[in-house]
Every structure is written in structure tokens, then in C-alpha cells.
Amino acid sequence: KKLGIAVVMSLHELDLAMKVSDRIACVDGTCISKIGTPEEIFSGDYVQKLYGIEQETFHPLTGEIFLRSKKEFPKVFVIGGAGVGLPVYYRLQREETPFAAGILFENDVEMGAARALASQVISVPAFHPMDEKALEGAKKVLDQCERAICPLQEFGPLNEANRALRDYARAKGILCEDN
């Protein structure tokens, strides 16, 4: 902008286009179907419709695209949050191991990936404490799993239920201590 130069790029990485573009022109086949700012293009479900992708596989706030996984009965319960569960989700997806994720806040950075990749997600509303109902629901799912993984290292007043869930998995003998 400062030099008065326009740069035209052809980007297929939506998250990169979202971060570096002032304006985006979307091509649908051989025609430009929409031109706008990243905020205009990526809000709503336009991108999902343009590319024919399912709602859960694209996160409009981050531009992330997730490969869909099979929604089978979970074998592993991942006790995550604050992003630490993401590498575990991706590994389990590569291994084609169905998993459950929880307890997550609805606004957690992991929610997009969890909704797309996990067979089941146990969550609570954003900015609300994890209540006994969520903990009991998570325990019921965990009881059906072969193992549990807890990459969380820190617990606080709002996610204390995840510590209880980790301890519950440990007492059942299914917690993988090495992740």
C-alpha cells in the first residue's frame, strides 16, 4: 500500500488468504463469483457453499480446513482445552482412531477441530464453569472408551472438572500417562 503497488496472488490456502489479503476474488469454475474483504468472504457459509464442503470441516474465524473423520464409537477420550489437545486430535485422525473430546468451552480454540474430527464432543457454554452435568456426561462417554489421554498440564477454577475427569480415568486404569 505504501508503495502504491498492487499484488495479485492465487491462493488455495484459505487461512493464508484471510491473513494477507485486503480484497479477495472468489472464482467459481471460470467466473469470479464474489469480491470482498476477508471479513465479507469468510463470514457466514459462503466459502462452504463455494467449495461444497461441510459446515464442520471449515472454521470461518480461522480459515482452518479439517479433513473429515469417521464418526464411529470413540475408543479414546481426549481431555483437552486451550489448544493442547490439537496435536492429539490430529494424530488420532491420522491413525484412524475414533475419539471423544472434552470437556471443552464452546469458544475454545480446539472446538473447530473437535467438532470436525471427534466422534463426540462434551462442551459447556463459553465463560461458564464446567458443571457436574458436563462431568457426569463426560464420565459416561469415558466409561465406554479403551483409553484416555490428558495433555492438559494446568487446571484452574473453571476447568477443575477436567482434573476430576483425568483422575477418574487414572483410577480406572485407562489414562495414558505419556500421551
Predicted feature residues:
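A short, gly/pro- and small-residue-rich
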Residues: 160-175
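A short, acidic, amphipathic alpha-helical segment used as a generic capping/interface helix at domain edges
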Residues: 132-141
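Conserved switch/coupling elements of ABC/ABC-like ATPase nucleotide-binding domains
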Residues: 25, 29-40
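H-loop/switch region of ABC-family ATPase nucleotide-binding domains
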Residues: 11-12
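ABC ATPase nucleotide-binding domains
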Residues: 51-132, 150-151, 156-159, 177-178
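A short, surface-exposed alpha-helical micro-motif characterized by mixed small hydrophobic
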Residues: 17-19
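Helical segment within the ABC ATPase nucleotide-binding domain
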Residues: 1-3
